[in-house]
UniProtKB/Swiss-Prot annotation:
Keywords: Cytoplasm, Ribosome biogenesis. GO terms for cellular component: cytosol. Belongs to the RimP family. This is Ribosome maturation factor RimP. GO terms for biological process: ribosomal small subunit assembly; translation.
Amino acid sequence: MYIGSSMDIQTILEKTLPGLGYELVDFELTAQGTLRVFIDKESGITVEDCATVSNHLSRVFMVEDIDYKNLEISSPGLDRPLKKAADFVRFAGQNAKIKTRLPIDGQKNFIGKIEGCENDTVTVSFDGKTVQIELGNIDKARLRPEFKF
């Protein structure tokens, strides 16, 4: 059986999930053969959503001859990764931690409020300052949830 490259798997996921009403947040294929798929939608993810996607993807991967040992479907969690411009638009007003590939004013790590994203440039405010970060310069970005007690 053909294991499938990451690109093949990504293409299948990007074509399949939107038709089911879900967004592909990320996926990973471990050395042990576990395929983890992180999904989301506006109203959040339930256990039933994970089961629905798992059943559907199992069939799709069988047809596409993609082999894996275990398939795990999950929500991305409260600290979900931010990868696309649409993620930064959707979560404008929320806090995030962003690590850049190249420093901006001598700094590579930013924790602040996402102000928005236009023309593939994310605007983040922190410590009374505002910085603009090109999407291509973002190495990692995650939401940073606030817990108020």
